[in-house]
Amino acid sequence: MVVGRGLLGRRSLAALGAACARRGLGPALLGVFCHTDLRKNLTVDEGTMKVEVLPALTDNYMYLVIDDETKEAAIVDPVQPQKVVDAARKHGVKLTTVLTTHHHWDHAGGNEKLVKLESGLKVYGGDDRIGALTHKITHLSTLQVGSLNVKCLATPCHTSGHICYFVSKPGGSEPPAVFTGDTLFVAGCGKFYEGTADEMCKALLEVLGRLPPDTRVYCGHEYTINNLKFARHVEPGNAAIREKLAWAKEKYSIGEPTVPSTLAEEFTYNPFMRVREKTVQQHAGETDPVTTMRAVRREKDQFKMPRD
């Protein structure tokens, strides 16, 4: 992995991050004070598929997905188009494809400008509300980015047309990746704006949860610390949560992303992936996954974040 440089030195950024953390301020607030330039890029090189993690706005992520064999690339949720164009040029790749997870402005709001900057782009998404859409997709639709396979997974709940993108290299030994937008976060999930607890259960446990355990999870926002604080509240005896939280605080303090996680990891510390576990059900006062999902999401929406 290669980490890009920010505008502050490591010590200065660490001090600022630690100060924010002591006051209970999350990564989004660091973004407000410092802007996106102080959140570092990250290049994840697993083989043929490379993923450039591009911080955007205050806590969003865009992802440049590169096929190293053909030098063709796709961009996931390009809310800051010029930054996308610059990243593609830096890597010397041809941007051909836009993968939009959902229609919210902080994910799809850059589509119209990007198609003006880069002609001939194919814009994929599962919702007619997505700007500049050229290819509407449904559950299990497939497409290619160079030699990479992309499978579209419908995960309605956060929005009714939400799509996650599962990317793999046929015949390759490298782990696959899934770009989850606002359905699955590190240690969390998206709010149920246009769906139900039953739909989120299906999305997390039946659609995403059945992907290979080593699948890299690239989510839409940097919410990891606060998500883990809530997870700790739900399962105070869970050592995996404590360890991941300490790790995430260190990453945050130096401006580095906490993505990707893996699906296997999510099943150890994400309360929304653990709604079948007795410890989570007992905390919620429920006995089945759907009612537990509903109760835990309701509690998370009202949770007062501790300042540690």
Curated annotation (Swiss-Prot):
SMART domains linked to this entry: Lactamase_B
Gene3D superfamilies: Ribonuclease Z/Hydroxyacylglutathione hydrolase-like (3.60.15.10)
Subunit structure as annotated in this protein's UniProt entry: Monomer.
Residues with the N6-succinyllysine modification: 229
Cofactor requirements of the protein: Zn(2+)
Residues the record lists as binding substrate: 191-193, 221-223, 297-300
GO cellular component, one term: cytoplasm
Alphabetized SUPFAM superfamilies for the sequence: Metallo-hydrolase/oxidoreductase (SSF56281)
Name by which UniProt lists this protein: Hydroxyacylglutathione hydrolase, mitochondrial
Tissue: Expressed in liver and kidney.
Domain of life (superkingdom): Eukaryota
SS bond list: none
Role: Thiolesterase that catalyzes the hydrolysis of S-D-lactoyl-glutathione to form glutathione and D-lactic acid.
Modified residues (N6-acetyllysine): 116, 229
Gene name as annotated: HAGH
